[in-house]
Amino acid sequence: MKNRNKALLATLVSLFAISAIAQPNITVLATGGTIAGGGDSATSSSYQAGKVGIDALINAVPETKKIANLSGEQLVNIGSQDMNDQVWLALAKKINQDCDKTDGFVITHGTDTLEETAFFLDLTTQCKKPIVLVGAMRPSTALGADGPLNLYNAVVLATDKSAGERGVLMAMNDKVVQGRNVMKMSTTEVQVFDAVNSGAEGFIHDGKVTYFQAPQPRGDKAAFDVSKLEKLPAVGIVYNYANASAAPVKALREEGGEGIVSAGVGNGNMYKTVFDALAKAAKEDVVVVRSSRVPTGYTTRNAEVDDNLYGFVASERLNPQKARVLLQLALTQTKDPQQIQALFEKY
């Protein structure tokens, strides 16, 4: 009997060990943000982003260890208002280099520029493993902090192999949104992100992922190869409004900008002085993209503005900040407005 019990115990231990080993390996790349923030009061909206390190974040959600083997790496620890090209490039290179070493990636990130990072990574990563961005609207010290559940759900999503067929994703407040479509819609609400022109990809509930939309398979290669890039071309955004000044156009050109995105009114329209300055810039080898400050809809080519005549590019479905990301990458390949227009129609 004792020998039988010992054999049974050994079998159970062996099965437990196999189960633990069989868990997917998820790499957590930390960049800071509110999810890593802390404040002096549990009820105050004042806090400092990027105070908590990745190990502390992971240890604060022990439930994640029941579904995956997590390894964390702190790339930077900043508020995402300070996100920059160097961090983007480091993230893309890291994911591409380590794709075969892990089963998926979770990237902790501030919400301010998360949509830009998500779009950049969607265009520059060739890894077909799940890549999930996650953030929080309340710091870890706040009552009702949303970060822990968001992180847990992001790990759940990263362990779903089929998520790798959907490009870069974001997981927050139980919602799954495609990185190309995600947009921040509120300055303070917990339900902060949406996909205004396409709808959410799915949702996560009780540790399970449900998808609303069919996947759009990624190609074998990234849209843009950034493996040898150390920086991106300089591109700025000019905001349009009643009686707008063209001074920002002049300033961007003096700084050596290779491209300018116009955050236009309506269907990408521009105030006359801004229009004239951008038309002049387009003639002088600066790529000009028309977008709109309106959060939904498309900026259509040759609508009220004759893009063919002035050499402008229409941003299609992209808002100004995402149009800037695509223009930066496009300029690493070409300065031809027609070729760049084709890229905007494709991506």
Name each model-derived stretch:
Residues 1-9:
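Bacterial N-terminal signal peptides that target proteins for export
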Residues 17-19:
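N-terminal signal peptide c-region/cleavage motif recognized by signal peptidases
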Residues 23-96, 276, 280:
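ATP/NTP phosphate-donor binding region
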Residues 24, 29, 53, 57-62, ...:
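Accessory alpha-helical/coil subdomains and C-terminal extensions
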Residues 108-129, 270-279:
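Short Gly/Thr/Asp-enriched flexible loops that form oxyanion-binding sites at enzyme active sites
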Residues 118-149, 155-159, 283-292:
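Short, acidic/small-residue loops that bind anionic groups at enzyme active sites
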Residues 267-347:
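C-terminal non-catalytic interaction/assembly regions of soluble proteins
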